[in-house]
């Protein structure tokens, strides 16, 4: 895998010549690396209620990135759980992954990393706003994947999220009755 320190050095040099430095720096502080194509990350912040109409028709918002990010997040977290809980059974690992990628957990992480404050939306109904952060976090993972690939998604989750905001050992012991949530 590409040395992230060297890669960030190259990206920070490129940043010197950019007009939109502040956006890049904002995402760098959140992610731990510079985006290459900032458009993915900006799109991750666009809630459906704040959609942008495209010239060729259609709307631009974070829903497609959220879909992709959900799938990638399941794979990345599954990978991390598999590596950290050697010898554990499939049911244990599935439950642990489910707790990490739960809407409650993702909403909390989005709040902690400052993502929730950056989301662009127009809905003022609090019932609709309750999952904005978690949905945007999934979209952010989709943006990272399209911009940098699976390895950076895993790097971000391992180095910026797990440990700082999610305690693997603690969450694996947390009792959750998934059937009662249905």
What do the PLM-derived regions correspond to, one by one?
Residues 1-182:
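Double-stranded RNA-binding/processing signature
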């Amino acid at each position: 895998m590409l040395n992230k320190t060297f890669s960030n050095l190259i990206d920070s040099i490129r940043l010197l010549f950019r007009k939109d430095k502040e956006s890049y720096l904002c995402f760098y502080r959140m992610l731990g690396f510079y985006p290459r194509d900032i458009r993915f990350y900006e799109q991750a912040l666009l809630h459906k209620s704040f959609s942008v109409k495209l010239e060729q028709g259609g709307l631009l918002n974070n829903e497609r990135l959220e879909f992709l990010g959900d799938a990638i997040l399941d794979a990345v977290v599954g990978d991390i759980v598999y590596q950290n809980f050697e010898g554990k059974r499939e049911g244990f690992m599935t439950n642990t992954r489910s707790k990490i990628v739960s809407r409650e957990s993702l909403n909390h992480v989005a709040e902690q990393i400052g993502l929730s404050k950056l989301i662009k939306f127009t809905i003022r109904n609090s019932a609709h706003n309750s999952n904005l952060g978690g949905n945007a976090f999934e979209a952010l993972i989709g943006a990272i994947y399209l911009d940098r690939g699976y390895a950076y998604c895993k790097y971000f989750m391992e180095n910026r999220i797990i440990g700082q905001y999610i305690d693997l050992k603690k969450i694996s012991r947390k009792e959750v009755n998934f059937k009662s949530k249905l």
